[in-house]
Structure formats: structure tokens, C-alpha cells
Amino acid sequence: MLFTPHLLAGAAIGLVADDWWWIVFLSLLFHLLFDLIPHFDPSYEKSRRYFLWSSLDLLCGWLLVMWLTKGIFTPNVLLGMLASIFPDVFSFLIVTLKLRFLNKWVEFHKKIQTDWSIFWGMAIQIVVVLVIVIWRFMVY
């Protein structure tokens, strides 16, 4: 999945969990669970286009979190956000820095994901984002 759904999930976990161990564990777990949902993901590459895409994605996720946490942005929320994107950042670093001894992680991370076309893959991610936004306003 893109960064935005992961960032929102991590922020939501940071809002409701008090213990930092649980925040990290649940954020990582939800990252992997979200990756099981069929989605669109650009492939890791050292290119201007990928950097721009990822930067805009991070910015959108950050801005959505700022909007959703209005005044209750805490270190726990930040920790949840960082932990939730760690698997993707780690995979990107392994691929781009050619850290071949860590390729098993990248293989595992790719294996659990089902890539769909940009249209359907983005539609699924928009639904995930909307569910988290609705949860924020209806439940928490």
C-alpha cells in the first residue's frame, strides 16, 4: 500500500494505545495486514518520478493525520506513524542500496502483497483511508 493508509493506521493506533511497545507492534502488524489487501504500489526505484510520488504520498498522509488529530498529535501518534511505514522504508533501502544479504525481507514483503492496476488498487486504498477517517469521527 501507499504510505498514506499506513500513516493513518499508525496514527490511529497511537491515538488509542498508551504503551509504546504495543504501538510499535500493532503498527507493524497492521502494516503487514494492510499489505495483504490487494492494492496498487509503485515499484522501488531510484528515480525522480518515484521520489516525487513517494514525497507527495507522505505529504498527503501527514496532512491527513494533522487534520484528523487536531490538537491531540502526541509522541505516540508520531511513533505509530513511523512504525507503520518502517517495513516499506526498510524494503526501499535494501533495494536501492543493494543490501543483498537482506533480500529475504524484500522477498517476503513482496510475496504477501497482491498488486492490482492503478485504478482498482487506488480505489481499494481510498476505501481504506475513508474507513479510518470515518472511524476517527464516529468512534474515537
What role is predicted for each listed range?
Residues 1-140:
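N-terminal membrane-targeting hydrophobic helices
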